[in-house]
């Protein structure tokens, strides 16, 4: 048999997931740096991060569940718990709409 990771569609999904994970990590570090060094755009960095990371983490977890098939939806699968946590964070950390409400004026001000 062939490993599931050797199918082209799964390879693409895994690659996209890794790109997303690295992008999320970079945004987190950039926002932390902006706060730590009291950058003028720290509010924007945090708002963008809080909008992007929960949404993207949920998408990555959904892809992992899709790769695992039915096993990914069982309560015993760790990815199912991760997906639930990610989805909960989308709500708990402030909805996407609130992050847009915070971000948009700051972005417009930056490019005036």
Locations of regions flagged by a protein language model:
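Alpha-helical interface subdomain recognition
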Residues: 1-112
């Amino acid at each position: 048999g062939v490993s599931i990771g050797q199918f082209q569609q799964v390879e693409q999904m895994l690659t996209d997931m890794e790109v997303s994970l690295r992008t999320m990590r970079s945004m987190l570090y950039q926002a932390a740096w902006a706060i730590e060094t009291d950058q003028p755009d720290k509010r924007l960095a945090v708002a963008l991060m809080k909008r992007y990371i929960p949404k993207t983490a949920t998408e990555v977890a959904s892809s992992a569940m899709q790769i695992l098939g039915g096993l990914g939806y069982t309560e015993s699968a760790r990815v199912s718990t991760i997906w639930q946590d990610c989805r909960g964070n989308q709500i708990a950390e402030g909805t996407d709409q609130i992050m847009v409400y915070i971000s948009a004026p700051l972005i417009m001000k930056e490019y005036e």
